[in-house]
Amino acid sequence: DSNPIIKVEFRAEYLTRCGYIEAIQRVELFLKKLIPEYEIKISEIHLCADVQGHEFNLLDTYKFKTNSRSTKLFESKDDKLSYLNNNVFTGFSMGNGDYMLRVYNKTHEIEKFKNKSYIKPLKWDINPKYNPNKTVWRIETQIRRNKLKTIVGDNGILDGFDVVLDAIPDLWAMSMEQ
């Protein structure tokens, strides 16, 4: 694919505040005013879930079955993200580039980076099941365009904008099975 004429990147905070459907509608409304005809291609999609009740640890990395050859383990040392240094376990990732799964301590991340704390009042605090005394872990999958356009969903190859959006539940399920 050639470089796009217009590239839109949604920031996590923006998506948290308005949701992906409203964000997309706003972009489409804007584009229609500028360009009468256009085609939208998704270059990358991130799907995530925040969970409580399980404290991930180093042993969990061995419980995951994966086709990936790349697994990175992270620990926190002096508030710097580094590879295993016999300190506090803060997460791991599997895969790289076009297809990746990350599991990380979101509570630790927002304590370390205050600009990411928007998630707490916007989502966690309003969830009756949220326990502020327990750690929140984020499970996140990242799928880039090169991988997306090799996946066949119910509505065909995940190359078109609407096809990818319709396949979000299937992409999440597929990510958890990989």
Residue ranges and their predicted role:
Residues 1-178:
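Structured, helix-rich domain cores that form ligand/interaction pockets
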